[in-house]
Amino acid sequence: MVNWKIGVLIGALATAAFTLLPFSNAGLIAATPQQSYASNVQLHAKRSSVDFVPDGDSSKLAWKQAKWAEFDNDASGNSHFPEILTRVASVWTETQIYFFFWCRYDSLNVYQGEDPKAERWQLWDRDVVEVFLNPLPERMNHYYEFEVAPNNQWIDLEIDKAKEPFNDASWNSGFAHATRIDAKNHIWTAEMRIPISSMNVSAIHPGAEWRTNFFRAAGNGGDDRRKFLAWSIIPEGKTFHVPARFGLLRLVK
């Protein structure tokens, strides 16, 4: 896979290269900045009365009461893959925001024999779920990326598309995460807890509206053989990094 996080192509190569890249988080070229949001999909994140430690178990009361979204379409919205149907939910407290992914799978493609405690560069080249999160939507091109793999490997990045390279792997959110694999039923789950202070947010209040998109990469081989799903579709691009297509995350009571 082309390693988009090393840098950004320059000058005249940029436009041409953008059209040739596979549809994945690993798109090398940032999309042209847009001034308004073009997606009307939304998810309600309900308030949790307590904070909790992620363990990958959806039986918690918070997740039973949560609003769930599901998607099986590729990032362009043109194809559907029910065999890797993905569900996602979010809840929040005054200091944390949580996400839970429930994922069908055929087979798993992960890095073998590595320490899941260490941040894993190029995690997007294996099976992964991803949250792109913008708590300050008026700042469209500055947001945060969180990835977790079935074996609980992870990476987090600060994205600023005004910079080259636009991704900062040195940023560390301190987010907690856990996964479970149900091999019998071919389901894997991932649970994330993100401190809002890591994103320069001092508090969450009911009624807040953030912008987000959820992604999943699955399958073996090169990008031409893998599947790349998106909650809010991106019909105009070849990269996940099109913040104008982020959906709406409503933080409600």
Where are these predicted regions, by residue range?
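Bacterial N-terminal signal peptides that target proteins for export
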Residues: 1-13
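Bacterial N-terminal signal peptides
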Residues: 10-25
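Structural preference for beta-rich elements and adjacent junctions enriched in aromatics
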Residues: 25-253
